[in-house]
């Protein structure tokens, strides 16, 4: 296994707090599954801030940012049954990673955290 990309992002929660009041923003950035999942969260600002940071971190791990027809909604963050966050692999993301790194199989790892004022995310993409 080889690390292909690493990305990290930090965001002030107050920036997301102001933005999530705008439904256009939420619908442009977050998938319908993420929006549905948010309804179960007690801390909406933390929920959206951590996911925003995770999307930015993934784009940085790719090394391309949001280019090549990649947008925020393409990068979907879900949780397993124990609550651990993970990047949901879509066909589009799989194709982008395969093309960018010229690999067939890969894994994505995600760690997210928040504190009162900030949320952060760390992403790793590696070959299998």
Model-assigned labels for residue ranges:
Residues 1-128:
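Core catalytic alpha/beta fold that binds nucleotide/phospho-ligands
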């Amino acid at each position: 296994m080889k690390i292909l990309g690493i990305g990290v992002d930090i965001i002030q929660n107050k920036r997301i707090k102001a933005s999530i009041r705008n439904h256009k923003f939420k619908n442009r950035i977050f998938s319908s599954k993420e929006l549905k999942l948010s309804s179960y969260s007690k801390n909406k600002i933390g929920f959206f801030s951590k996911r925003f940071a995770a999307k930015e971190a993934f784009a940085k791990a790719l090394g391309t940012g949001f280019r090549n027809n990649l947008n925020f909604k393409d990068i979907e963050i879900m949780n397993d049954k124990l609550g651990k966050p993970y990047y949901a692999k879509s066909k589009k993301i799989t194709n982008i990673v395969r093309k960018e790194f010229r690999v067939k199989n890969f894994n994505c790892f995600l760690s997210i955290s928040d504190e009162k004022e900030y949320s952060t995310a760390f992403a790793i993409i590696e070959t299998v």
